[in-house]
């Protein structure tokens, strides 16, 4: 599944998630709004719905103009802007909830998924089969892990290079989380 290409032309993403692009670009907020506008997302409303492909086109331009580290920052902002189930109180529940939140914040067709697997008491795996870029998903997972990290533990998130990668034409990317 290629990066930056929606799985269905009818998929939409909620505006509060789109606004993560603006928040993730920090001092370059105006550039983010300009890029979004150029791709058909003018003055996004947190409660509005926008075609996912327009948002992905904006991501691609940000990647090409500003760099992949900005996509990571945008991913890190998602937990601050997206709707998540209220009962999350541990790193395991937080990581497992990414798929639920992903489906709450998208509608209109096939969107892909985030598959969570607990590998041990302090380890987990997430397989991300969606059209978002690797760096974005890495930032999203890092943010969720840090937000719900156990006291005295520092989470680590790595892209599993032994597994397929969307950037290299794979259908998914795999991330390993330890804490």
Over which residues does each language-model region extend?
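Short, non-transmembrane amphipathic alpha-helical segments
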Residues: 135-150
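Short terminal or interdomain "cap/linker" segment that borders an active site or interface and mediates
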Residues: 107-130, 134, 150-179
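N-terminal leader/assembly segments
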Residues: 1-65
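Compositionally biased, intrinsically disordered low-complexity regions
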Residues: 17, 26-28, 42, 69, ...
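Amphipathic interaction/junction segments at domain boundaries or subunit interfaces
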Residues: 40-135
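Generic hydrophobic, helix-prone segments enriched in Leu/Val/Ile
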Residues: 21-22, 75, 95-98, 157-158, ...
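Serine/threonine-rich low-complexity intrinsically disordered regions
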Residues: 25-28, 47, 67, 115, ...
């Amino acid at each position: 599944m290629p990066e930056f290409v929606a799985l269905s032309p009818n998929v939409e993403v909620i505006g509060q998630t789109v606004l993560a692009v603006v928040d993730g670009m920090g001092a370059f907020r105006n550039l983010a709004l300009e890029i979004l506008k150029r791709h058909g997302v003018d003055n996004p409303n947190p409660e509005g719905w926008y075609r996912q492909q327009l948002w992905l086109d904006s991501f691609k331009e940000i990647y090409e103009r500003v760099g992949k580290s900005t996509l990571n920052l945008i991913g890190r902002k998602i937990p601050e802007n997206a709707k998540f189930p209220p009962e999350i109180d541990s790193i395991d529940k937080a990581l497992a909830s990414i798929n639920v939140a992903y489906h709450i914040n998208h509608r209109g067709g096939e969107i892909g998924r985030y598959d969570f697997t607990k590998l041990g008491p302090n380890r987990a795996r997430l397989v991300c089969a969606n059209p978002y870029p690797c760096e974005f998903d890495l930032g999203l997972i890092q943010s969720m892990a840090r937000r719900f990290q156990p006291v005295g533990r520092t989470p680590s998130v790595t892209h599993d290079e032994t597994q397929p990668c969307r950037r290299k034409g794979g259908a998914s990317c795999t991330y390993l989380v330890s804490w």
